[in-house]
Amino acid sequence: AQAYGDNTPILMLPGAHAPAMQDYDPQFIASRSYRDITKFATMINDPRSLVRKFEMAFSALKNGKSGPVLIETAAPLLWGNWEGEKPNYVSPPRLRSKADDTDVAQILDALMSAKRPMIIAGHGALYAEAWNELRTFAEFMQIPVTTSLLGKSVFPENHELALGCAGRTITKAAGHFANESDFIL
């Protein structure tokens, strides 16, 4: 649940009961129980679906909003022998989205006209590996930066523009700037 709430991409691989035992109660079925707190949750009972389901899982891990993925595999499948043609796994591509140019222009106009702007950087900046770009932008524009707890290391805390971390708790400086800011990016 925490990984889902924090948009953390992790792959969970729990074992499952043999298919013949899955209909008996009480049986914990992870793929069913975790469906609402994962991006993708599935069970593999047939070796012929193994490659396809792993491709689907890794596509979910690589694309869109980050989050946990679960593939539950029946124990007999893990212990069995593969019969038939060796599957050809192809890693799915990572698709990147791009901000709309019109939206970027409007945000930039609002930022340029702001008198007391502030940046809140989250873990998306970490996943994008944009720490250098963030620092360069903040320094060039002279905009103070606070980070979310998950994005804490994206901006140096000893930097003169650093306001510290904000989340359920917030530093006094970040709270002051957030209350006084006329534009938060």
Which ranges hold each PLM region?
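N-terminal alpha/beta PP-like core and its mobile active-site loop of ThDP/TPP-dependent enzymes
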Residues: A1-L185
